[in-house]
Amino acid sequence: MASKQLKLVIITGMSGAGKTVAMQSLEDLGYFCVDNLPPSLLPKFWELMKESDKMDKIALVMDLRGREFFDSIEPALDELDNTNFITTKILFLEADDKVLVSRYKETRRHHPLEPNGSVLDGINAERELLSDLKGRSQLVINTSNMAPRELRERINNEFQTEDKDVFNVQLMSFGFKYGIPIDADLVFDVRFLPNPHYIDKMRPLTGLDKDVYEYVMKWPETGAFLDKLIDLLMFTLPFYKREGKTQLVIAIGCTGGQHRSVALTEYVGKAIQQKYETTISHRDMKRRKGR
């Protein structure tokens, strides 16, 4: 059986240049991320990853916090270059001296190479030690004039998978009586619609049942609301994606999360599915039946 091809991104560069933001961005893109792995463990780590059938994209932050970094990084990279089941890309982050000094002053941290001395001396020493590694990097990003959001957007543009954009919309119905979902990005209240709960034969059913679904959908206000809601979502979703979000949770609530919210979540989910990867769930639909 042929070995699977693994993707490795090594995040390195100047201290204070944004390596943490880069790692978080790659994690959002589906990469398994490891912070501060000693270079000498890199080949052994990859042998373990090769055996895993769940991981094919790995991002490693490697920098001078590992004291052996400068002695062992080059041999480790040479060994990776000779490994045929790994595609390696080195991402090097840097920033101008003035910007790095300012960032250190804001955080009141010491530079790791000059813990008791001048921050600028530490920056200069680090820049010199990293010069060879910067030269063999496939992607160098200067973050001097970048806000964290802009760096995330740049990382997304560089590393998003070619076959499919990484953006998932999660549609969730819920009941207000059980609380608003804490992970919801957008919440819509549909308690203004006629309630099937007050019709005896529909009370034990849910919005997944045909009778309830058709009852909820027959009202003019339902159709008007759905048209406006879907139009709003189709307008705003591309902008959420542009801002670097890889997941958006949309919660639609009624009183108990049984009828109206379930029916509308199903309808909206099917509309969104035509353009975006979409997951539909009903948080509170089974609560009453379970009692």
Swiss-Prot record:
SUPFAM superfamilies: P-loop containing nucleoside triphosphate hydrolases (SSF52540)
InterPro entries: P-loop_NTPase (IPR027417), RapZ-like (IPR005337), RapZ-like_N (IPR053930), RapZ_C (IPR053931)
Binding site for GTP: D63, L64, R65, G66
Binding residue positions for ATP: G13, M14, S15, G16, A17, G18, K19, T20
Keyword entries, A-Z: ATP-binding, GTP-binding, Nucleotide-binding
GO molecular function terms attached to this record: ATP binding; GTP binding
Signal peptide limits: none
PANTHER family tied to this protein: RNASE ADAPTER PROTEIN RAPZ
Protein family: Belongs to the RapZ-like family.
Function summary: Displays ATPase and GTPase activities.
Protein name: Nucleotide-binding protein lwe2422
Native source species: Listeria welshimeri serovar 6b (strain ATCC 35897 / DSM 20650 / CCUG 15529 / CIP 8149 / NCTC 11857 / SLCC 5334 / V8)
